[in-house]
């Protein structure tokens, strides 16, 4: 599955830097397959041999804006990574050129990339992103009808994991994240108990999940959040929440 990553889309929480390298999700890959007998095969991305499918469950994914996931579409890609998968609905891949892409760079110290002639591609050399600790919400409060605020007990960077039971298909679950709640001050009258969003600037920090029905788990994979408090909307009861 493919999302914006650092390639395209919003690159900061300020909302002024977009599409540093390209304006469409793109994949450039070289896969080296090593067989049991030691022989190797190199597979590279090419419109001649690759296909794509853009009607999967991940509708949108962004580091700072969040993820939109429609679980009803999971069946459309069931088994896609297994031999024998029927890909008749998939389309031939197309080449995405780097020239003349539309970008917006507002930060004074951020260079606008429009010349790739001096670029040298290197494989990732840092550690892969992985979970190092799992936290469970310390408390949950229904601050408005159908709106639950979860207190994680500390600020951290992570992704949520919420288990849903007995859901009907097509229910939209809305999740928002913040570092704290509104203080009990006159200027914030009317927002008592709600999570405070002003300090995350232009970042939406929001996930939307559309249920497929039955038992399912919300676990975004193409976004990260600074979480201290989380708001879950469109449920009639609180659900188990981990980060």
Feature-to-residue mapping (PLM):
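Extracellular/oxidizing-compartment recognition motifs
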Residues: 1-243
């Amino acid at each position: 599955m493919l999302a914006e990553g650092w390639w395209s889309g919003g690159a900061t929480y300020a909302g002024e830097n977009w599409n540093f390298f390209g304006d469409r999700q793109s994949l450039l890959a070289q896969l080296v397959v090593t067989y049991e007998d030691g022989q190797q095969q190199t597979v590279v991305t090419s419109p001649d041999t690759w296909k794509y499918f853009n009607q999967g469950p991940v509708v949108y994914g962004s580091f700072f804006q969040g993820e939109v996931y429609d679980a009803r579409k999971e069946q459309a890609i069931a088994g896609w990574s297994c031999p024998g998968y029927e890909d008749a609905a998939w389309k031939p891949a197309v080449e995405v050129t780097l020239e003349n892409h539309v970008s917006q760079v507002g930060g004074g110290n951020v260079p606008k990339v429009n010349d790739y002639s001096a670029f040298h591609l290197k494989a990732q050399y840092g550690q892969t992103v992985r979970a190092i600790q799992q936290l469970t919400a310390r408390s949950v409060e229904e601050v408005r009808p159908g709106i639950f605020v979860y207190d994680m007990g500390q600020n951290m960077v992570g992704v949520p994991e919420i288990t849903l039971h007995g859901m009907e298909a097509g229910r939209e679950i809305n999740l928002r994240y913040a570092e704290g709640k509104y203080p009990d001050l006159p200027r914030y009258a009317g927002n008592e108990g709600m999570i405070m969003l002003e300090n995350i600037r232009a970042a939406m920090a929001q996930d939307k999940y559309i249920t497929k029905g039955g038992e399912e788990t919300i676990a975004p994979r193409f976004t990260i959040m600074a979480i201290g408090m989380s708001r879950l909307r469109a449920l009639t009861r609180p659900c188990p929440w981990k980060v």
